[in-house]
Amino acid sequence: MNRTRSRIIRFLLRNGPSTCGQIGMGIGASPSAIRRQLGLLTDAGLVQRSSAQFSASAEQVQLHAAAFEASFQVTVMPP
């Protein structure tokens, strides 16, 4: 996950449902960058959109993080 997406998720978890403009002002990113990243986060299920506001669920973020971590674990089989 890139830095902007991480900052968006942290912002939403701290501040609750927010508009694209509020997120951009909060993390210091352009509206076009925010919209692009919010689209990716929404498609991944990490962010939900309701009307003009976006929100993040701590539970969903934790589930995705655990799945991501598990995808990199290597299982060592005994000889």
Regions picked out by a protein language model, each given a short descriptive name:
Residues L38-G39:
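Short, hydrophobic-biased segments on the C-terminal half of alpha helices
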Residues Q22-M25:
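A short acidic, leucine-rich amphipathic alpha-helix
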Residues S6-R10:
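Pre-recognition alpha-helix immediately N-terminal to the DNA-recognition helix
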Residues R3, N15-T19:
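Short capping segments at the starts of secondary-structure elements
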Residues T42-A52:
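A short, conserved structural fragment
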Residues S32:
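Key DNA-contact positions within bacterial/archaeal DNA-binding proteins
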Residues S55-P79:
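Conserved segment of winged-helix/HTH DNA-binding domains
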